[in-house]
């Protein structure tokens, strides 16, 4: 279910681009000439501003828009102080065994996990099926490509124009990474909770999440990694080879072939 959302801008100089974006996403366009708290026709707006493309909730008490941002805030803090290859996500994909892995992040969302993997030297291909999220992600990658510290990292991130189900089986990846939408109950920061609330409200749960595992297993050369909240069932009721447990969630790892057999 996708709650009502339209593309909007307050900038006359961006109106033409915003209309084209709305058309490409099959969404209404709104030229915004009033504060978000007074907008009632749409639950959310995909705002095109000089800062980029962000999603904003409308109505009374509307918070600031959410953007894909790889250059500041929590994402940048993790890049600089996140623990490197000692992080659970690094161990889950196998970076403790081999470097420079090719990874397909088939449920990219805001691209945070993909960015972490790219920071650690992986070549990451990203899939995002929801049009407005993909537009935000593309915008965030574009803006980051001009940042002196981050440009080299995002150069290792490639946003695909297709979903995982449309990828040719001959296009293999060392690792396929899945993080399907699920009703998380973790103790995230207020900012992270706001972002996730947006996407759960707008996009809803991934109803076909179980079917993604089969596609992932066909495309992965060495392993499939599934990120799950604590207490969540196995994807497609398929027991993993092993698990890595964290404070608020876990990684289910499906090993197809040992990474030790990957030629250097």
From Swiss-Prot:
Query: SUPFAM superfamilies, per this entry?
Result: S-adenosyl-L-methionine-dependent methyltransferases
- Entry's EC annotation: 2.1.1.242
Q: Main localization of the protein?
A: cytoplasm
One Pfam family assigned to this protein is SAM_MT
Keywords in alphabetical order, please.
Answer: Cytoplasm, Methyltransferase, rRNA processing, S-adenosyl-L-methionine, Transferase
Q: Which reaction does it catalyse?
A: guanosine(1516) in 16S rRNA + S-adenosyl-L-methionine = N(2)-methylguanosine(1516) in 16S rRNA + S-adenosyl-L-homocysteine + H(+)
Reading the lineage from the top rank, the first entry is: Bacteria
Annotated HAMAP family: 16SrRNA_methyltr_J
Would you tell me the protein name for this molecule? Ribosomal RNA small subunit methyltransferase J
- Identify the species of origin: Marinomonas sp. (strain MWYL1)
